[in-house]
Amino acid sequence: MPVEKLKLTIVVLFLFLLNLMMFGCSTSQLTKYELGLESYNNGRYRSAVEYFTRAIWEDPVNAELYFLRGNAKAKLKLNDEAILNYTTAIKLDPEMKYYENRGLTFIETEDYLNAISDFNEALLFDSTSSTLYFNRGYTQALSGNYESAIKDYSRAISHDSTNAKVFVNRGDLWSGVEEHQKAIFDFTSALSLNKRDELAYFNRAKEFAKIGKFKQAIDDYSLAIILNPTNVEYYFLRGELKVGAAEFLSAAADYTKIISLQPDNGNAYYNRGICYANINLKDSACDDLNRAGELGFFEAYEVIRKFCMKEEKKKKK
């Protein structure tokens, strides 16, 4: 199943939790700890690394300091170094959040097997964590283990049914195994939680189209467009459905919008030309088809030969 949907939806909860407990620290270490936290919270991750490193020099067996330095390094995309810090924290004092964040960082390095292993370990601390099941499900999907991913998303929902993203991700997977009604149910559930979920409208529209419910599909594309009026793909897909319903003028309006967003889109000119041809606007149709050809959409020339040049020959006769 293509995982490209997951790119639009997949939304890992990459939260690097900061433990504000400061027991067991000397006064000087506490200051470095606090300065590290302040730097981290203000987005100064390199400074945070420096402060946490100084704190570690004074207390090299404090697991929390390695965890925090790992968080800062992960923010800097120093993923291998972050993983080493989380690993040290785990060796010193295994905690759920250490495994969780190392698992999330393994995802960043595309080491999905180790990520899943870390989420398994984290779940031993809390088997009711919806977030952990979500993250493991996401990783399973990236690994191509779709059945396991669906099970994990279902577990996540059983522990917390208020997260629209989980429904969207599970709906994507149902779609991939052609369980279209289940996919529609999940996207509808997501929209009941978040009526501004553009991706849920978009995905549900595609599912409606697959089962022949074209009006519902057009309606959902329209709602997605309201939320994101510059997404060219939405107009293309809605336009295609309108053409299928012989709503050529309305479809032409969608292609006109695409052209306003992407003036060099040869496909949009071609499609609009076909729409114009179907409503007997021959001059406009041929102008668009010629423009499509100029922009590299070479299929247009065959239509020009059969439609536009044929009309010219008739006029000459």
Feature roles, as predicted:
Residues 2-6, 13-15, 19, 23-317:
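Alpha-helical tetratricopeptide repeat
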